[in-house]
């Protein structure tokens, strides 16, 4: 079976395609389209009609590829930019109607929880997995038998545009102080790889 995921992020829309069997999953292909939703959301507060049309056009291109590649199932997830825009529900409804497919806008904590699905994340104690996105940063810490997760409104685009808040940095600092036994920090996501 072929499956795909679509991530509507702050910097880009990304898709990954996988071949699955009952016992394995194999990466086949990836697509990335730099739409930059976050710059508009963090500067103007909402997504414009023009930006929504650009997003719809991109998603329709992905859908054509999924049809051509015989993808059996795919899910579209949206993160910081779509959850932070003041017209979030209107935008989602508009997009869903145009592409005839549901979009799930996930919370920052849901994003952090997803890190825990990586096989290494639940085997290695005292390590912090940090996903620095364009609009937010999610942290997953595993310390057998429990884990801790948190999300902060501190992403690369938000910081670059000087839309980060001192209060959020203080919240991050306070949260991290409870973990004095962290031995390693592992960075995840495109913003980390870009450096």
Q: PLM ranges: what are they?
A:
Residues 1-10, 16-130, 140-195:
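Nucleotide/phosphate-binding catalytic cleft detector across ATP-hydrolyzing
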Residues 11-12, 135:
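Short acidic, Gly/Ser-rich segments with clustered Asp/Glu that frequently serve as metal-coordination loops
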